[in-house]
């Protein structure tokens, strides 16, 4: 587990400790005691102004109607109604939301915002703690072995780099076939005799698929509506440097910098988080120095810049605010990737437009963090990898339970 730090143009704003290391006290007392000395600039009076939000959190799930009322409200309006100080909003809540739900509070559902703050920070003292994988990546260490096991034991076929381009259904609603397209070659294909489909896609993918699947969209209009929801652009950067640079906290958040252009950003010192496994970070090249991973969220303006402009902003304007030694480091290799519309946007009033777990078509189910799970609902109804995983299991169980497929 690692601590993290929050940075602004004024310097270090706050640090988040490893909450599990502190005395385990009833929430929110444990969190309050663990962070009482961690805010470097925010006065106590501003911190205390957030108390009204705790009352609203208790009210949130009193009934579905109350939840939808909060969902229709944007988070900034709620904060101001609760008389949270502007300084608390701008110096703490706004940066947290830009890297937690990837949008500023005025663009987020108040309901989803409260759930994020509750389940990640208040429900359990150590829920905000993050443990980093010791080497390589989650994809290499967890997902790839799982994929190989499913392929070997259950004859799963994984079509990497392949999009579902059209879902063909019969007039009775049965799934007939799925048309595909290779991202690399543009080659098209068809998967026939489809028993069931799990739509594990975001709003952008759903909208694109439904636009090409007229019969499916007509029989399941809730999917077409879901495809009209917004999504968030992300930019990911990895930098390999010619020297090692020590940073006090290997996980960091940037906020309010002009170079961010309205985005939220994080950076992680991978060589510190994966100490002892540096060679894996450098592949077949000799180890030279630090390796940095940085992500920008709400990054439409960042994505319009060239790769070099993004790297220069990190090396010249952002990273030196944390450690001046970055100004003297040279980038020996770099990777910049853009992911347009890749993250769910939980905008005000979006809950009823989000796709349901079980659709109007018996053989089509949905999975993902934005899916409404009905009677199987639990936990935060917003951005959450664990929720997406559990929703995938529930989607498969739904098909089995209703006899659509056999297992």
Residues of each region from the PLM?
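Dinucleotide-binding Rossmann-like beta1-alpha1 core, especially the glycine-rich loop
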Residues: 1-56, 64-65
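Flavin (FAD/FMN) cofactor-binding core of flavoprotein oxidoreductases
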Residues: 98-101, 317-359
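A conserved FAD-binding loop/helix module that cradles the flavin
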Residues: 372-399, 403
């Amino acid at each position: 587990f690692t601590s993290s730090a929050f940075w602004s143009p004024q310097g270090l704003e706050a640090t988040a400790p490893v909450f599990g290391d502190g005395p385990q006290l009833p929430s929110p007392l444990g969190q309050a005691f663990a962070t009482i000395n961690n805010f470097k600039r925010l006065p106590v009076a501003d911190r205390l102004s957030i108390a009204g939000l705790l009352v609203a959190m208790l009210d949130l799930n009193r009934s579905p109607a109350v939840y939808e009322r909060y969902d229709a409200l944007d988070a900034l309006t709620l904060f101001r109604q609760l008389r949270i100080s502007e300084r608390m909003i701008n110096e703490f809540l706004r940066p947290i939301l830009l890297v937690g739900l990837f949008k500023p509070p005025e663009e987020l559902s108040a309901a989803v915002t409260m759930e994020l703050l509750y389940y990640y920070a208040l429900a359990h003292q150590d829920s905000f703690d993050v443990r980093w994988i010791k080497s390589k990546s989650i994809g290499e260490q967890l997902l790839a072995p799982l994929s190989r096991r499913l392929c070997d034991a259950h004859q799963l076929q994984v079509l990497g780099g392949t999009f579902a381009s059209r879902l063909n259904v019969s007039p009775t609603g049965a799934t007939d076939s799925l048309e595909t397209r290779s991202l690399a070659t543009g080659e098209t294909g068809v998967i026939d005799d489809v028993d069931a489909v799990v739509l594990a896609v975001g709003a952008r993918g759903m909208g694109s698929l439904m636009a090409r699947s007229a019969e499916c969209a007509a029989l399941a209009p809730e999917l077409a509506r879901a495809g009209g929801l917004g999504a968030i652009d992300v930019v990911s950067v990895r930098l390999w440097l010619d020297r090692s640079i020590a940073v006090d906290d290997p996980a960091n958040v940037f906020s309010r910098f002009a170079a961010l252009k309205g985005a939220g950003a994080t950076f992680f010192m991978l060589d510190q988080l994966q100490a002892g496994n540096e060679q894996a970070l450098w592949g077949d090249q000799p180890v030279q120095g630090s390796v940095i991973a940085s992500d920008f969220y709400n990054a439409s303006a960042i994505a319009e810049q060239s790769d070099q402009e993004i790297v220069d902003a990190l090396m010249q304007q952002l990273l030196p605010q944390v450690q001046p030694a970055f100004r003297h480091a040279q980038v020996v290799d770099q990777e910049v990737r853009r992911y347009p519309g890749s993250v769910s946007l939980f905008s005000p009033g979006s809950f009823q437009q989000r796709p349901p777990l079980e659709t109007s078509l018996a053989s089509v189910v949905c999975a993902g963090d934005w899916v409404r799970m009905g009677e199987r609902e639990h936990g935060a109804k917003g951005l959450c990898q664990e929720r997406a995983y559990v929703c995938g299991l529930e989607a498969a169980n739904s098909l089995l339970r209703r006899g659509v497929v056999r297992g």
